[in-house]
Amino acid sequence: MSNTTKKPLSFSCGATMPNRFMLAPMTNTQSHEDGTLSNEEYNWLTMRAQGGFGLTMTCASHVQANGKGFPGQLGIFSDIHIEGHKRLAAGIKAHGSLAVVQLHHAGMRSPEDLIEGQPVSASDIKKHNARGLSLGEVQQLKTDFIDAAKRAQQSGYDGVEVHGAHGYILT
């Protein structure tokens, strides 16, 4: 039986992981309240890349301001976030790890006090006081996910992963 964990893994886009160890996206709550990258989050993630992960994924990065799921969440919903993401992607890649950002919208799980408004969902959900999105808002959400992916590409990430679990907007 061969050990494949230490073997490279190539993707069709041309990126290659030096090994098959991947850092899962975790909730760090270390970034600034406006979604910009903090030194703490940068240090935490680049330290993991330095530790030998073949792929290092960021924590969930929200694609709309009203999609924030927790305090200190990294954002990617505005061009003000690009500088920090460029720094982070470069810092991760400097250690030989692929850099991937997780795109996220907390949907009905966005705390009202955190987003200063009512959470949104595919339909009204009384349990979470979430209101259903209008068709126009669905189209805007689609555009915002695409724009976030473009910001990730501009920032130098090797890829994106879309968070679709836990009752979030794309569950």
Positions of PLM-derived features:
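N-terminal capping/small domains of soluble enzymes
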Residues: M1-H104, L141
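Glycine-rich, flexible loop/turn motifs
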Residues: T5, F70-Q73, E116, S121, ...
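Aromatic side chains
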Residues: Y42-W44, F77, F145, Y157, ...
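Generic hydrophobic/aromatic pocket-lining and core-packing "Φ" positions
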Residues: L45, A89, A149, Y157-V160
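Short beta-strand segments at enzyme active-site cores
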Residues: T56-C59, A99-H104, S155-I169
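Short acidic/His/Gly/Ser-rich catalytic and metal-binding motifs that mark active-site loops
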Residues: Q64-K68, S110-D113, I169-T171
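General structural feature for long, well-ordered alpha-helical segments within catalytic domains
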Residues: H81-G84, L88, S134-E137, L141-D144, ...
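Non-globular sequence segments
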Residues: L98, H104-Y157
